[in-house]
């Protein structure tokens, strides 16, 4: 069971706890462009969830998520928290752009800062508040080498990689990018016509991707607008994926399909992506606070 705190205070986030277990912890339920995010504050020495606990949290009523952002004490000077990112199958992710914006909102409202830095497995991430519910996140530089994605074998050009799959529609090669997570982007004429639930999971586990991959299908509508649908590694079909939006813009620009800045249309909303001349990728988009919930003991009664 979870207890819903229906009426958050003007400061709608709990103060950092100190010690104890996950039971009784308050969780901020948020979304970034439709991406379902939980922000769990474990600063003060509380142990991180195990993979089984991560799955159990997702199965609990009111706590289902695409990504769980677990905040721990900072490990590097100048940062406010170390963020461990869980997919809803209990696996870990290196980056989550939409979730990072939600974390930035949580910490900005806590500290009053408009600019802040957090740390993830992918490195330091600078965040900036642009408006009451709008944030820009520096997603860093894309990694483009075949061994950085990683792929199972060397390829001559990561802009165009054949990913053969029996029975799959003729959609051409993928462009592969690592934006903290491995991504494969297929550019198609009609993104709405792709059977995402059928082909997404099959491409995700293709032998070419030893760490699996996030699979995106993108339709370029103009030099500055792309429609996108995403099958997220360890999650499934989602309404939005920030790192996939970044990977898609980088891929489109490398192929000469767009400029280095574009609006990415996702089922849950829009994100603005800019690939700067110094190679950094900036993502700008909305966040929404939904409610707080409390993790109760029976959430973990049958975790596995």
What are these model-derived regions, one by one?
Residues 2-7, 20-133, 184-304:
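A glycine-rich beta-to-alpha transition motif near the start of alpha/beta enzyme domains, typified by
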Residues 11-13:
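Low-complexity, intrinsically disordered or signal/transmembrane-proximal segments
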Residues 135-137:
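Intrinsically disordered, low-complexity regions enriched in acidic/Ser/Thr/Pro/Gln residues
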Residues 140:
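Segments forming oxygen-rich coordination pockets for charged ligands
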Residues 143-145:
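Ligand-binding beta-strand-loop-alpha-helix segment within the catalytic cores
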Residues 152-162, 201-209:
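Short, conserved active-site entrance elements at the starts or edges of catalytic domains
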Residues 159-193:
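Internal active-site segments that recognize and position negatively charged phosphoryl groups
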């Amino acid at each position: 069971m979870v207890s819903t705190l229906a009426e958050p205070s003007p400061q709608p986030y709990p103060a950092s706890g100190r010690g104890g277990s996950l039971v009784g912890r308050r969780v901020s339920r948020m979304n970034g462009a439709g991406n379902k995010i939980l922000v769990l504050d474990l600063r003060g020495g509380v142990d991180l969830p195990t993979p089984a606990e991560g799955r159990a949290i997702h199965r609990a009523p009111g706590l289902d998520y695409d990504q769980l952002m677990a905040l721990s004490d900072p490990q590097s000077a100048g940062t406010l928290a170390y963020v461990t990112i869980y997919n809803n199958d209990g696996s870990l992710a290196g980056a989550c752009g939409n979730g990072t914006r939600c974390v930035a909102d949580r910490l900005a409202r806590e500290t009053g800062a408009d600019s802040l830095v957090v740390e993830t497995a992918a490195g330091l991430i600078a965040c900036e508040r642009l408006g009451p519910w709008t944030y820009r996140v520096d997603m860093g530089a894309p990694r483009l080498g075949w061994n950085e994605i990683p792929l199972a074998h060397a390829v001559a050009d990561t802009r165009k990689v054949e990913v053969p799959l029996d029975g799959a529609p003729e959609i051409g090669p993928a462009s592969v990018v690592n934006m903290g997570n491995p991504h494969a982007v297929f550019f198609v004429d009609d993104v709405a016509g792709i059977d995402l639930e059928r082909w997404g999971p099959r491409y995700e586990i293709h032998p070419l991707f030893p760490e699996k991959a996030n699979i995106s299908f993108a339709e370029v509508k103009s030099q500055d607008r792309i429609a996108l649908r995403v099958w997220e590694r360890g999650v499934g079909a989602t309404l939005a994926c920030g790192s996939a939006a970044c990977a898609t813009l980088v891929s489109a620009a490398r192929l000469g399909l767009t400029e280095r800045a574009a609006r990415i249309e996702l089922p849950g909303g829009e994100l603005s992506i800019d690939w700067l001349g110094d190679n950094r990728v900036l993502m700008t988009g909305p966040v929404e606070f939904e409610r707080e919930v409390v993790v109760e003991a029976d959430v973990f009664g049958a975790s596995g």
